[in-house]
Amino acid sequence: MAMTAQYIPAAYSLTAVGAWGASDFLGGVGARRVNAFLFTAIVHISGLVVVGALALMTGAPFPGNASLVWSLIAGSLGGIALALFYRALASGNMGLVAPVAAVLGAAIPTIVTAFAEGFPGYRHVLGFILAGIGVWLISRTEAGVGRPKGLGMAVLAGIGFAGFYLCIHQAGNASALWVAACSRSAALLVTGSIVLFGRHLRAVAAPVLGIAAVAGILDISGTIVFIRASQIGRLDDAVVLSSLYPAVTVVLARIFLHEHFSRARTIGMVAALAAVPMIAG
């Protein structure tokens, strides 16, 4: 029973991998057809409706003041980061965009957690390294040399994701549903303001609305289970395992968009799979 409980945080994190990976695949597709900030705002609306309804139906207790503030800060950072990430993906220069955002987003919280909660152990560290290598190899492409156009946005997105992880962890053991709902409200406020003041508001075709709605449901689902993983386990474990989401994005792109699956990506998949038991154990 104890062994089963030990793997529950990892199970939550890997569920987030599936949800976030699928959401980012849809985000990359949808953000090519409409302004990235507008698309992200629609994603946030969809997610907020779902998580808000769940929180109300389950009667989950509303967070205290401290948890509420941290949730709002996390949502603001995460909302901007997601919009920048979608815009970077939509730029078409993905050679470094996805791995930079994912690895940077995981590395910063991992370092902070090591100082705050202590050294995680050599086995976990080896798993972190393998996961980082795996994410990089899975996400990178062979195309192009020089500096990709989306690199700066990818760096900012990675820093924003790191800030989201760290702040959402500070919300403590408050209801994951309400923490997710509050953070998503802040994310919508930020991205919605950018859309309105930046004059990005446009009519959106029904298929794109559908893509954004599904992406929003998947994204908020990943956020909820990530919050639970970080609440019952170490933040660095939850962040590093969850950062493997590009593997799902790449597999979906291979299946539906027939993108090339290189030898480097295969090696990255193996490294990522090998990292899971090291981090979870």
Cite the ranges covered by each PLM segment.
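C-terminal appended segment following the main domain
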Residues: A229-G281
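Hydrophobic/small/kink-forming positions within alpha-helical transmembrane segments
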Residues: V17, G21, F25, V49-G52, ...
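Hydrophobic alpha-helical transmembrane segments in multi-pass integral membrane proteins
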Residues: V51-P61, P109-H124, G160-L177, D219-D236, ...
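Hydrophobic transmembrane alpha-helices of multi-pass small-molecule transport proteins
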Residues: S46, V51, A107-I111, P120-R140, ...
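Specific alpha-helical transmembrane segments that line the substrate/conduction pathway
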Residues: S71-G79, Y86-G132, A180-A186, L235-I255
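Membrane-interface interhelical linkers
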Residues: M1-A19, L26-L72, L82-G92, T141-G152, ...
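Alpha-helical transmembrane segments of MFS and MFS-like solute carriers/permeases
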Residues: Y12-T15, W70-I73, L77, L130, ...
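Residue-level recognition of transmembrane alpha-helices
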Residues: V17, T40-H44, A98-A102, H124, ...
